[in-house]
Amino acid sequence: MSHRKFSAPRHGSLGFLPRKRSSRHRGKVKSFPKDDSSKPVHLTAFLGYKAGMTHIVREVDRPGSKVNKKEVVEAVTIVETPPMVIVGIVGYVETPRGLRTFKTIFAEHISDECKRRFYKNWHKSKKKAFTKYCKKWQDADGKKQLERDFSSMKKYCQVIRVIAHTQMRLLPLRQKKAHLMEVQVNGGTVAEKLDWARERLEQQVPVSQVFGQDEMIDVIGVTKGKGYKGVTSRWHTKKLPRKTHRGLRKVACIGAWHPARVAFSVARAGQKGYHHRTEINKKIYKIGQGYLIKDGKLIKNNASTDYDLSDKSINPLGGFVHYGEVTNDFVMLKGCVVGTKKRVLTLRKSLLVQTKRRALEKIDLKFIDTTSKFGHGRFQTVEEKKAFMGPLKKDRIAKEEGA
């Protein structure tokens, strides 16, 4: 510490080294929850897309606390989660060196958005992926082989996972290539898992079948990229005094003369952001239903509550900034999550047994804010804005042109 007579803790954690750009854009599940055969068969993870943030008002249910039975305002994140399609089954056997893939079976029909994932350039390709494989499901020899594969998986496998992909055409994004991932199937016996997965081949699985209201989940994703940053921004080291020669936002001493190299633990400039991160214990405040047609009418009121009966959708006025409108099922999570808008996020069931009172608290939303997130929004719905503003000039011009 040079001539200082006191020490200080180091700046920045060494637990996240190396701080470099993530090799994958989609968050990777490095461990799934522990299997419990006494529970019914269920999936353990799901993919969603970050739409944006808003705030809610709710009444706290925490007896003995100072805020019990009082209203609190909390920030929430909206993650759009259209149903995922199951297109494959993978069986694993446990070996002394860990899990090993035993067999992989794909469905007969696979959509183009999923096939795009197997090509670097879909436009220039011959688009022949799985054409030979899908014939297995049609001829007699192929069917016999598939039956043998299923029976051998029941006999030898200990872990069953399904291959599922997202439906990009349902989202307000330009990307056409679906995100594909393996999701572990937990609960029941291996035979029950395999039967469950086989029944759902080529079927859609909604998020409501994976997660429940008030559940604590983990969010895995890649953080927002910041580019190449200096040492003060990247490691939050202290700025040097004003009169320092050759810059202030630096580290004055980067180590001793010997060993004659800079240690890995010394804060240096470099990449900041776009790192792979897993955040645990995010509470689900609401699992919302997407737009649906009932009796020939489009039902959008997925942001109404027992206290706020106004007919409004979860979308703020003008849509979510840099995202658009959420028209599919969505998950409302407490607080913030990693990544930028439109970023794909992996939602995973918690690995822990939740015992804390905050984790088990029942959430009853009183109000969901839907004002415009582009500036200082004042109105919750379009009708409220029209009632306050009165007839606008553009309305009068349109009326005159119509007449």
Curated annotation (Swiss-Prot):
Region (Disordered): 1-38
Cross-linked residues, Glycyl lysine isopeptide (Lys-Gly) (interchain with G-Cter in SUMO2): K39, K224, K226, K286, K366, K386, K393, K399
Record's compositionally biased regions (Basic residues): 18-31
Subcellular location: Nucleus, Nucleolus; Cytoplasm
Any Pfam family hit: Ribosomal_L3
N6-acetyllysine carried by residues: K136, K286, K294, K366, K373
Top-level taxon: Eukaryota
Protein modification: Constitutively monomethylated at His-245 by METTL18. Methylation at His-245 regulates translation elongation by slowing ribosome traversal on tyrosine codons: slower elongation provides enough time for proper folding of synthesized proteins and prevents cellular aggregation of tyrosine-rich proteins It is not required for incorporation of RPL3 into ribosomes.
Gene Ontology cellular component list: cytosolic large ribosomal subunit; nucleolus
Presence of the UniProt keyword Acetylation in the record: yes
Glycyl lysine isopeptide (Lys-Gly) (interchain with G-Cter in SUMO1) cross-link site: K294
A GO MF label: RNA binding
Modified residue annotations for Tele-methylhistidine: H245
Family to which the UniProt record says this protein belongs: Belongs to the universal ribosomal protein uL3 family.
Functional note: Component of the large ribosomal subunit. The ribosome is a large ribonucleoprotein complex responsible for the synthesis of proteins in the cell.
Subunit structure: Component of the large ribosomal subunit. Interacts with DHX33.
Protein name, as recorded: Large ribosomal subunit protein uL3
